[in-house]
Amino acid sequence: MSTLQVDIVSAEEQLYAGQASMVIAPAAEGDVGIAPRHAPLLTRLRPGELRITPEGDEEEFFFYASGGLLEVQPHKVTVLADTAVRARDIDEAAALEAKRRAEEKLREQKDEVDYSSVQAELAEAMAQLRTLESLRKRAKR
């Protein structure tokens, strides 16, 4: 079976380095699935879930990335994330609170509110919560 070398790196640390049979990433224009021998690609990441399927029957790994770059070569995938965490390390209470605060700011509609940054905050919180939900669904199987 053919595999890819996958590296997930943030400014703080390297979160993952290993072989995988599939990577699913939140590219700017939509999710992309990357298998071995994929065509070269360089794209921005939007906030969302990264899913790594290791070779063999091992369980998938889930990560959250706040954005960054995805570089794909035929046998290598590199994620350079602005911020990234393992899904199991996401603070659900903090994500829910960030979501609540962003929604409140959007409802207030004050002149000094920077709507694009508030929408970005809301998108990040929602992406973290979706990543946690995916992890929980996989755990139930």
Curated annotation (Swiss-Prot):
Pfam families: ATP-synt_DE, ATP-synt_DE_N
Predominant place of localization: membrane
Superkingdom as given in the UniProt entry: Bacteria
UniProt keyword terms in alphabetical order: ATP synthesis, Cell inner membrane, Cell membrane, CF(1), Hydrogen ion transport, Ion transport, Membrane, Transport
UniProt keyword Ion transport, yes or no: yes
Topology of this chain in the membrane: Peripheral membrane protein
CDD domains xrefs: F1-ATPase_delta (cd12152)
Sample GO molecular function, one term: proton-transporting ATP synthase activity, rotational mechanism
Compartment(s) where it occurs, according to its Swiss-Prot or TrEMBL record: Cell inner membrane
GO cellular component terms, A-Z: plasma membrane; proton-transporting ATP synthase complex
Family: Belongs to the ATPase epsilon chain family.
Subunit structure: F-type ATPases have 2 components, CF(1) - the catalytic core - and CF(0) - the membrane proton channel. CF(1) has five subunits: alpha(3), beta(3), gamma(1), delta(1), epsilon(1). CF(0) has three main subunits: a, b and c.
Job description of the protein: Produces ATP from ADP in the presence of a proton gradient across the membrane.
HAMAP family per the UniProt record, alphabetical: ATP_synth_epsil_bac
NCBIfam families the UniProt entry points to: ATP_synt_epsi (TIGR01216), PRK00571.1-4 (NF001847), PRK13442.1 (NF009977)
Protein name: ATP synthase epsilon chain
